[in-house]
């Protein structure tokens, strides 16, 4: 009996050792490709590092101070704020409408429609940007072709070359690309709403619009809050690719966004220190949104 107990005591450390060995590769990769680059970016943001990497000097907060005196950065920040104020709201609303229609209309082709609406999210964002660049092209683009066909030639323009419309073309492309993704999440939430609630509303004479506004949305407020924060974060990240592919930040910075301006400073102008300061600033915004998302998730779980 004593020998068996001694063997069990000796065997206890083995599972712990096995767990440590199993986790070690993930820890090493996280340190190499996440923690260390983040620390290095934070350090470089306090230096005047350039692409040559010579004579990097510690400049303290100079990059951050200059950031808010840089008109191009301010323009990129304002453009990003505009997208964050408009795109998530419209995207979530459109995805809710699509989800409600597909949830209520019991069609045989339901799977097909869900797939079609979700498909833009599967396509590479670079490909999406190229496709919509052709759609908005002033000469061969379908937008100007349609306007010409219906006699609205006065509205034809170079959509991506006009400072008044370039940013909103990117916003529309973001909406088209992301609506299907959030639609799937909202459909999953709507499937959890009892059909009896909708039936009672129908007997009371409620329209489909009233069911969406007064029944579905209040019951889904937690998941809507989460998807809204995800849409905010996605707008920051995805707008960079579309801005770079569709307009390159032009014309004259009219469609430049934070990450696109960071890319220009770091990889075009070679101002790595300043680019890293912009990166850290953008990262701080993303972390704040992630914390808000986690808070909403915890609140949702606590209410269930």
Where are these regions (language model features)?
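Short, Lys/Arg-rich, polar N-terminal cytosolic tail immediately upstream
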Residues: 1-13
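A structural signal for multi-pass alpha-helical bundles of membrane permease subunits
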Residues: 11-304
């Amino acid at each position: 009996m004593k020998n068996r107990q001694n063997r069990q005591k000796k065997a206890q450390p083995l599972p712990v050792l096995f767990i440590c060995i199993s986790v070690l590769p993930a820890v090493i990769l996280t340190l190499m490709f996440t923690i260390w680059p983040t620390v290095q970016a934070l350090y470089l943001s306090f230096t005047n590092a350039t692409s040559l990497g010579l004579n990097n000097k510690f400049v303290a907060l100079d990059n951050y101070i200059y950031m808010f005196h840089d008109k191009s950065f301010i323009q990129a920040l304002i453009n990003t704020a505009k997208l964050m104020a408009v795109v998530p709201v419209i995207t979530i609303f459109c995805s809710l409408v699509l989800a409600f229609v597909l949830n209520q209309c019991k069609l045989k082709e339901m799977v097909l429609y869900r797939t079609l609406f979700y498909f833009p999210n599967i396509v590479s964002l670079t490909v999406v940007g190229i496709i919509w660049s052709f759609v908005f092209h002033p000469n061969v683009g379908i937008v100007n072709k349609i306007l010409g066909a219906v006699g609205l030639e006065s509205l034809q323009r170079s959509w991506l070359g006009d400072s008044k419309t370039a940013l909103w073309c990117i916003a529309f492309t973001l909406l088209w690309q992301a609506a299907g993704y959030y639609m799937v999440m909202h459909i999953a939430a709507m499937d959890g709403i009892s059909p009896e609630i909708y039936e009672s509303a129908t007997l009371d004479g409620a329209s489909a619009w009233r069911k969406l506004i007064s029944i579905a949305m209040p019951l889904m407020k937690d998941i809507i809050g989460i998807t809204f924060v995800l849409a905010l974060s996605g707008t920051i990240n995805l707008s960079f690719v579309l801005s770079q592919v569709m307009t390159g930040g032009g014309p004259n910075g009219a469609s430049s966004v934070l990450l696109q301006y960071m890319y220009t400073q770091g990889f075009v102008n070679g101002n790595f220190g300043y680019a890293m300061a912009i990166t850290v600033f953008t990262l701080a915004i993303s972390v704040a949104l992630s914390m808000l998302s986690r808070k909403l998730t915890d609140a949702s779980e606590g209410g269930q």
